[in-house]
UniProtKB/Swiss-Prot annotation:
It comes from Janthinobacterium sp. (strain Marseille). Coiled coil: none annotated. InterPro entries: ClpS, ClpS_core, Ribosomal_bL12_C/ClpS-like. HAMAP family: ClpS (MF_00302). Pfam families: ClpS. GO terms for biological process: protein catabolic process; proteolysis. This is ATP-dependent Clp protease adapter protein ClpS. Binds to the N-terminal domain of the chaperone ClpA. The gene is clpS. Involved in the modulation of the specificity of the ClpAP-mediated ATP-dependent protein degradation. Belongs to the ClpS family. It comes from the Bacteria.
Length: 102
């Protein structure tokens, strides 16, 4: 689409093709020290999981060594990782939380 001004200048509107943001999955990693109930609490508080879903993810972390908490744009995933790590440290647990590009 072109816009012509009185002074003769012509502005051309250039179509922008926006791609969706890169998505990242947030993972909890298993360790031998963090209580299972604390992992369930983290999943409920920071990932809005109901108790049953949080328990299923916690069991996956325990059984498989890691569990997916959710998939988010980079900034949100990064913030969630930081919040979980800070909460775990303050509670004295070595729980690890990481993000991976999907």
């Amino acid at each position: 689409m072109a816009i012509k001004h009185d002074d003769g200048t012509v502005l051309m509107r250039q179509e922008q093709k926006l791609k969706p943001p890169s998505m990242y999955q947030v993972l909890l990693l298993n360790d031998d020290y963090t209580p299972m109930e604390f992992v369930v609490l983290i999943l409920q508080e920071y990932f809005s999981k109901d108790r049953e879903t949080a328990t299923q993810i916690m069991l996956m972390v325990h059984r498989d060594g890691k569990g997916i908490c959710g998939v988010y744009p980079k900034d949100i995933a990064s913030t969630k990782v930081e919040l979980v790590l800070n909460h775990a440290r303050k509670a004295g647990h070595p729980l690890q939380c990481v993000m991976e590009e999907v």
